[in-house]
């Protein structure tokens, strides 16, 4: 089975926008960043948006915002980029994995349900579950 890592759709317009920034005086933190954040707010009807350099950073910030800390548990898929687990470790939490559905390579709903029932009996529910979608 080949699991696709990503399905990028990079247009000529995207490439031109990147080249424009690379040729400007701002490689980082230039006017394109707040413009992007504002457009994201408008698109999502959110009051605020913060652009970060990677999904790793975004997941870490999300865990902090949700109060993940030492003693907490985060569950994710074993078929993922390491950031899905590392974000918990950065916060001092424990990582555990939920089995996948072999037909989809995604987190199995049945495995998640069974694991939740067992965790509830033990009084050790996860604070965060990060599913991974390909």
Task: Pin down the residues of each PLM region.
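Structured binding elements
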Residues: 92
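A short beta-strand submotif of the Rossmann-like class I SAM-dependent methyltransferase core
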Residues: 51, 76, 128-131
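Active-site loop/turn elements of alpha/beta-hydrolase fold enzymes
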Residues: 79, 100-102
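Active-site phosphate-binding strand-loop segment of PLP-dependent enzymes
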Residues: 103-134
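Phosphate-binding glycine-rich loop
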Residues: 26-73, 87-89, 97-99, 121
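Conserved coil-to-alpha-helix start sites within the AMP-binding
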Residues: 80-85
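N-terminal "arm"/small-domain region of PLP-dependent enzymes with the aminotransferase-like
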Residues: 1-26, 31
